[in-house]
Swiss-Prot record:
InterPro entries hit by this protein: ERV/ALR_sulphydryl_oxid_sf, ERV/ALR_sulphydryl_oxidase, Sulphydryl_Oase_FAD-link_ERV1
Cofactor dependence: FAD
GO cellular component: host cell cytoplasm; membrane; viral envelope; virion membrane
Family: Belongs to the orthopoxvirus OPG072 family.
Gene Ontology molecular function, alphabetical: thiol oxidase activity
Domain ERV/ALR sulfhydryl oxidase: 1-95
Keywords, sorted A to Z: Disulfide bond, FAD, Flavoprotein, Host cytoplasm, Late protein, Membrane, Oxidoreductase, Redox-active center, Transmembrane, Transmembrane helix, Viral envelope protein, Virion
Subcellular localization, as worded in the UniProt entry: Virion membrane; Host cytoplasm
Cystines in this chain: C43-C46
Enzyme class: oxidoreductase
Name the record gives this protein: Probable FAD-linked sulfhydryl oxidase OPG072
Reported function: FAD-dependent sulfhydryl oxidase that catalyzes disulfide bond formation. The complete pathway for formation of disulfide bonds in intracellular virion membrane proteins sequentially involves thiol-disulfide transfer between OPG072/E10, OPG128/A2.5 and OPG088/G4.
Species the sequence originates in: Vaccinia virus (strain Western Reserve)
Length: 95
């Protein structure tokens, strides 16, 4: 399934989950939700790419919410189809 049809919605959910963890402080629940989202992406190639990136960057073993947050911002920026959609990390406040 083409990410063009579902990508923005999934990225919105990912950043909502991260923001919620910034409010409630439950990093473990956040990581479980994020891993569930990534491991059920409708595109097998996207699922594989995201899962490998999470594993290669030790996201699931991190207790630093901002490390996880900025990881997903970098992942989003790497996958953005057009540079105009990239997130300017200099304008992002830590959670």
């Amino acid at each position: 399934m083409n990410p063009k049809h579902w990508g923005r919605a999934v990225w919105t959910i990912i950043f909502i989950v991260l923001s919620q963890a910034g409010l409630d402080g439950n990093i473990e629940a956040c990581k479980r939700k994020l891993y569930t989202i990534v491991s059920t992406l409708p595109c097998p190639a996207c699922r594989r790419h995201a899962t490998i990136a999470i594993e290669d960057n030790n996201v699931m073993s991190s207790d630093d919410l901002n490390y996880i947050y900025y990881f997903f911002i970098r992942l989003f920026n790497n996958l953005a189809s057009d540079p105009k959609y990239a997130i300017d990390v200099t304008k992002v406040n830590p959670l």
